């Protein structure tokens, strides 16, 4: 089948750098299905690349001057491509435990071609046991001399690169017949495809991704490496939404800033003019490709795209670029500076290199130091699947049984050819990272029976649309909570999507897995064994201290402020939806649960909106509605704060109060602080209660403002003694809990306005009187 630009990388089969669309990208990796080819380079000079039609691309990483003492050497490299020799990488330093195929469990086939396969694997031995990786397995016998060189070059480059925005090589090893590369498994998918399908983003959002990409190029160039294959398929998202540059099969090493390479390679639409005309290219070629990516991100279109490849190349060499009028002056300026056909005049080609690009006005608001340290949150977090999910891969491959078949050695000296190939990353021994646990979105949830993997235990809760049970995973005997939602009565898609993106937050309930059958959705969540927040007070039969209450409120505000910053409103922050994960009720184990009524900000076309997009392009009435939802979250926490401090609710006097009575008190907006208990509470606490319960949502503090309030900020210095029980009296906390629930129910069931005939409205009656009076006056005048 033919592919078109914009098709998800998953359908191409590879989200970590082996794209079946350009076989050259796969030359050190996988030559996937020929009918999946999309980007094909044209060659007329057989010295540039092999003329074999099954291997239409050649390596693009070019090293421009190897750093001194870098542990490898390149022998007899000639930049005119007239001759090539093998690369001796025997001097690469190895550290830590040596890996071999027996240490990896094969989980799925991710791709397959004439060179070998790509597997999803899990490490089953060693300190990083349990980690999931992508494993390229290459058959030595099928690798031509040029392919062997590129394979070792890719391994060589990746072994010496450690950068937050570049894919990491963890191990490289070989058997007599095969080569193995163990890489990051990136589950976030292709950045541009994901964003174009899921989220509305703006020029400010583009700055973030382009800045991270610029830092990646800066690092490569500092090592003397020209990337030469910058395109959307090679820029992927990690679990947090940061980019990772992948696929170094087309990169080239060992040229300095004044030398050039003459290879014709890459993807035509992203090629610089000097690559097409074969006059030699340097690192500046990457900056042209950066401009193409920037243009595509901002407009959704390629800057140069003809009827066919030849026409596209002609446009790149000669056509005048049409600059969209809606781009800012800074964006247009940067694009023009990157699209200089004379590479010597191109921004970044000067003596300061990438620094010239970083100093451009387009990036004026970007703090590159914080960005490099990942101290700036990405504008978009992908909805991730389980740690070993392959939902973004071609099912043609993933449905196959993973099997690493034996291979004959390439030749009698096959092992010697790849001498020094083995490698173990330093980080493998030094870092012990937790595996992120999240889940598939509902459309791709697991469809095998939930009871195949879990045993359902006792019921622990229920709601209007769902029931919650304890459950136990059969394989590990670990206990979870399973929320079962009937599809016929409630659509859980939004709830699952929100938890996929945000359950990593410390104070949001963790979502581990999702199952789906014909009648229900099964959400496997963290089991909160500490129970409800107010149950703790019920059991204590006394109030906590201000210090304890402030710690609880700080954590809740932290979670709500995060959700609001991500364009999510919970809209159901009742006391029953705030639980403790641990039995000891430590405030650090607080969890906000039940996102059934939560909402994400979406554009009219259903796509998610980043904060920048929301602020710039959303209608005022939509913003007011979003602000109202978020303000209600703060109000709900204000009710809870009042109750925890005083032992009574602000608007319900007892369990027998009617909704109308409660709503009347809420509408009055009067909060009495005359009870003796308030005499024992600090003025700062009283001030925060008033601000969170302000009847006017426009005056009410936001979650961020509440989190910055003085009372929260000085929580460690607050009194640690319980609020005096003699002032409160004997607490019936069960009645307090019921009264609090009545308050939330009253708000949720606030009666809607009863519509009556138009003629019965006061305005209609007044106008009718005016008409009757006018007619009366007219008749009187006529009779006179």
Swiss-Prot record:
Activation and inhibition: Activated by multiple phosphorylations on threonine and serine residues.
Domain Protein kinase: 104-363, 454-712
InterPro entries, per database record: AGC-kinase_C (IPR000961), Kinase-like_dom_sf (IPR011009), Pkinase_C (IPR017892), Prot_kinase_dom (IPR000719), Protein_kinase_ATP_BS (IPR017441), Ribosomal_S6_kinase_II (IPR016239), RSK_N (IPR041906), Ser/Thr_kinase_AS (IPR008271)
Molecular function per GO: ATP binding; magnesium ion binding; protein serine kinase activity; ribosomal protein S6 kinase activity
Binding site for ATP: 110-118, 136, 460-468, 483
PTM annotation: Autophosphorylated on Ser-422, as part of the activation process.
Reactions accelerated catalytically: L-seryl-[protein] + ATP = O-phospho-L-seryl-[protein] + ADP + H(+); L-threonyl-[protein] + ATP = O-phospho-L-threonyl-[protein] + ADP + H(+)
Record GO biological process: TORC1 signaling
Gene3D superfamilies: Phosphorylase Kinase, domain 1, Transferase(Phosphotransferase) domain 1
Cofactor(s) the record lists: Mg(2+)
Enzyme Commission code(s) on record: 2.7.11.1
A GO-annotated cellular component: nucleoplasm
Active-site residues, record numbering mapped to chain: 229, 572
Similarity comment text for this entry: Belongs to the protein kinase superfamily. AGC Ser/Thr protein kinase family. S6 kinase subfamily.
Primary role: Serine/threonine kinase that may play a role in mediating the growth-factor and stress induced activation of transcription. Suppresses germline tumor formation by preventing the dedifferentiation of secondary spermatocytes probably downstream of mpk-1.
UniProt protein name: Putative ribosomal protein S6 kinase alpha-1
Phylogenetic classification of the source organism: Eukaryota, Metazoa, Ecdysozoa, Nematoda, Chromadorea
């Amino acid at each position: 089948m033919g592919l078109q630009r914009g098709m998800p990388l998953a359908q191409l089969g590879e989200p970590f750098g082996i794209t079946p669309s350009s076989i050259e990208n796969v030359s050190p990796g996988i030559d996937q299905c020929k009918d999946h080819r999309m980007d094909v380079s044209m060659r007329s000079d057989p010295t540039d690349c092999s003329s074999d039609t099954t291997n239409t691309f050649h390596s693009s990483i070019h090293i421009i001057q190897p750093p001194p003492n870098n542990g490898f050497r390149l022998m007899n490299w000639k930049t005119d491509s007239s001759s090539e020799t093998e690369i001796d990488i025997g001097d690469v330093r190895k550290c830590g435990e040596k890996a071999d195929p027996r240490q990896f469990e094969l989980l799925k086939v991710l791709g397959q071609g004439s060179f070998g396969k790509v597997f999803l694997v899990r490490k089953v031995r060693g300190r990083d046991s349990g980690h999931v990786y992508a494993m390229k397995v290459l058959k030595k016998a099928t690798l031509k001399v040029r392919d062997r060189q590129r394979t070792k070059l890719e391994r060589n480059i990746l072994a010496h690169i450690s950068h937050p925005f570049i894919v990491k090589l963890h191990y490289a090893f070989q058997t007599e017949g095969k080569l193995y590369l163990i890489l990051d498994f990136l589950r976030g998918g292709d950045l541009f495809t994901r964003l174009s399908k899921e989220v509305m983003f703006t020029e400010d959002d583009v700055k973030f991704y382009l800045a991270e990409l610029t830092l990646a190029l800066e690092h490569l160039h500092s090592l003397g490496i020209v990337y030469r294959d910058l395109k959307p398929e090679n820029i992927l998202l990690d679990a947090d939404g940061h980019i990772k540059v992948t696929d170094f099969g087309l990169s080239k090493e060992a040229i300095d800033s004044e030398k050039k390479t003459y290879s014709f390679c890459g993807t035509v639409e992203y090629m610089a003019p000097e690559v097409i005309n074969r006059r030699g290219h340097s690192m500046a070629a990457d900056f042209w490709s950066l401009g193409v990516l920037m243009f595509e991100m901002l407009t959704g279109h390629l800057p140069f795209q003809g009827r066919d490849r030849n026409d596209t190349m002609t446009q790149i060499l000669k056509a005048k670029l049409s600059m969209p009028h809606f781009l800012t002056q800074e964006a247009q300026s940067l694009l023009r500076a990157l699209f200089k056909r004379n590479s010597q005049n191109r921004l970044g080609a000067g003596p300061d290199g990438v620094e010239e690009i970083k100093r451009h006005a387009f990036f004026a608001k970007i703090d590159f130091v914080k960005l490099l340290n990942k101290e700036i949150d990405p504008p978009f977090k992908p909805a991730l699947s389980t740690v070993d999910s392959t939902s973004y891969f071609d099912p043609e491959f993933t449905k196959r049984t993973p099997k690493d078949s034996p291979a004959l050695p390439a030749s009698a000296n096959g092992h010697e050819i790849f001498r020094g190939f083995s490698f173990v990353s330093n980080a493998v021994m030094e870092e012990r990272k937790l595996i992120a646990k999240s889940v598939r979105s509902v459309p791709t949830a697991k469809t095998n029976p939930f009871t195949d993997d879990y045993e359902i235990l006792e019921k622990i809760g229920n709601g209007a649309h769902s029931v919650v049970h304890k459950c136990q995973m059969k394989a590990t005997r670990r206990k979870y909570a399973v929320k079962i939602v009937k599809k016929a009565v409630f659509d859980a898609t939004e709830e699952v999507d929100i938890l996929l993106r945000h359950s990593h937050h410390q104070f949001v309930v963790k979502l581990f897995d999702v199952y789906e059958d014909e009648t229900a959705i099964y959400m496997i969540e963290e089991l909160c064994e500490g129970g409800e927040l107010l149950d703790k007070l019920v059991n204590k039969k006394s109030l906590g201290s201000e210090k304890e209450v402030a710690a609880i409120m700080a954590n809740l505000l932290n979670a709500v402020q995060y959700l609001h910053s991500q364009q999510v409103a919970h809209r159901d922050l009742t006391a029953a939806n705030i639980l403790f994960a641990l039995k000891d009720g430590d405030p650090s184990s607080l969890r906000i649960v039940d996102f059934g009524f939560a909402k994400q900000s979406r554009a009219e076309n259903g796509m998610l909106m980043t904060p920048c997009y929301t602020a710039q392009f959303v209608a005022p009435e939509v913003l007011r509605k979003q602000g109202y939802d978020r303000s209600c979250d703060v109000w709900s926490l204000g009710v809870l704060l009042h109750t925890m401090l005083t032992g009574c609710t602000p608007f319900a006097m007892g369990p027998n109060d009617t909704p109308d009575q409660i709503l009347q008190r809420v509408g009055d907006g009067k909060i009495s602080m005359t009870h003796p208990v308030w005499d024992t509470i600090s003025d700062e606490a009283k001030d925060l209660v008033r601000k969170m319960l302000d009847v006017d949502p426009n005056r009410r503090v936001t979650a961020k403002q509440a989190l910055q309030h003085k009372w929260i900020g000085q929580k460690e210095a607050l009194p640690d003694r319980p609020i005096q029980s003699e002032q409160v009296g004997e607490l019936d906390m069960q009645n307090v809990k019921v009264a609090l629930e009545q308050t939330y129910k009253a708000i949720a069931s606030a009666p809607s306005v009863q519509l009556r005939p138009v003629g019965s409205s006061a305005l209609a009656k007044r106008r009718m009187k005016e008409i009757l009076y006018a007619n009366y006056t007219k008749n009187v005048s006529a009779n006179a």
